[in-house]
Amino acid sequence: MIGTPYTEGARRAMLLGCGELGKEVAIELQRLGVEVIGVDRYANAPAMQVAHRSHVINMLDANALRAVIELEKPHLVIPEIEAIATQTLVDMEAEGVNIIPTARATKLTMDREGIRRLAAETLGLPTSPYFFCDTETEFNQAISEIGVPCVVKPVMSSSGKGQSVIRDIALSHKAWQYAQEGGRAGGGRVIVEGFIPFDYEITLLTISAVNGIHFCAPIGHRQEDGDYRESWQPQAMSDEVLAKSQAIASKVVEALGGYGLFGVELFVKGHEVYFSEVSPRPHDTGLVTLISQDLSEFALHVRAILGLPIPNIHQHGPSASAVILAEGTSSNIRYQGIAAALEAVNTQLRLFAKPDIDGRRRLGVALARDIDIDSAVSKALDSASKVKVIF
């Protein structure tokens, strides 16, 4: 049952994290009459601008997080980022609070160690070789055992922060320092992974719903500096590789439990598929689904967490997204060239309305459909390039 916002019978959902992905989730929740409460570490975050009300707290502060949940008494608590006091969510779930998809899933996926050990050691899924390191001495030993090239990431980071590829052992100290600076909680534990010379990488959006497990068409993407720049759907792959990908994604999602959409990241090399990471929430590469599917990843996530069925997912055809990236310092961001960016048929824009910028930041995305993937990517890139960010 869903009531009406601001009434006694309202169904209340609290978003922990109010960025561009949370904003789309908030919109989809409101389309189904859910009262939305946004929570983030800074004011006027994108999802706060469309939520019914909002709170600014340090979400790594266990007491502050507990206090806001106890104040609002939401029926659903929906983590949309990793930087949260997850043990508080575990404790509150045990007290009866409904954490989406589960507090365990949120805690396991908050850091790379929890989910990598679940995938490789518990589920026996194929992954790259890896070591976890607390000191630079352990780090150097791991590199010598794995060899170069190898990938270094803080166990707690996002958007490529602190991530690098070591191709020369002489650069290992620099990579260690960069990883220490890039972690969400400051310096700390890192993972050193063997580099898989993959043919391509995909995000397989996997939905656990009341009527079973569902998959979106695979999404291909290009990364730069550890963050996505373009994504496209569908990624071409054989039926055999798709079946292997879906089998891996199903195992991970079923092990994490709960209802919702999961972004499962996989590497493909020939006929082999390797597990990389998973997010128990919509994925940034999945922004392409805003134009590629009848139900976007955000709509699917909301249906699943509300316990609603997903009869089918229709993919419209070759589609792409291209990031609108800017670099600078401003609290008065403006955009020009929007009309030019939307001149071509089957193009759309999403401007995230982030309140400020200090350094490099993703501020929007261009979306496009065309006759094939290459054309769709080219059209999305062209559209994105026409948007000029003014400070």
Curated annotation (Swiss-Prot):
The keyword Nucleus does not apply. It comes from Shewanella baltica (strain OS155 / ATCC BAA-1091). GO terms for molecular function: ATP binding; magnesium ion binding; phosphoribosylglycinamide formyltransferase 2 activity; phosphoribosylglycinamide formyltransferase activity. ATP binds at residues 112, 153, 158-163, 193-196, 201. N(1)-(5-phospho-beta-D-ribosyl)glycinamide binds at residues 20-21, 80, 284, 354, 361-362. Transmembrane segments: none annotated. Keywords: ATP-binding, Ligase, Magnesium, Metal-binding, Nucleotide-binding, Purine biosynthesis. Involved in the de novo purine biosynthesis. Catalyzes the transfer of formate to 5-phospho-ribosyl-glycinamide (GAR), producing 5-phospho-ribosyl-N-formylglycinamide (FGAR). Formate is provided by PurU via hydrolysis of 10-formyl-tetrahydrofolate. This is Formate-dependent phosphoribosylglycinamide formyltransferase.
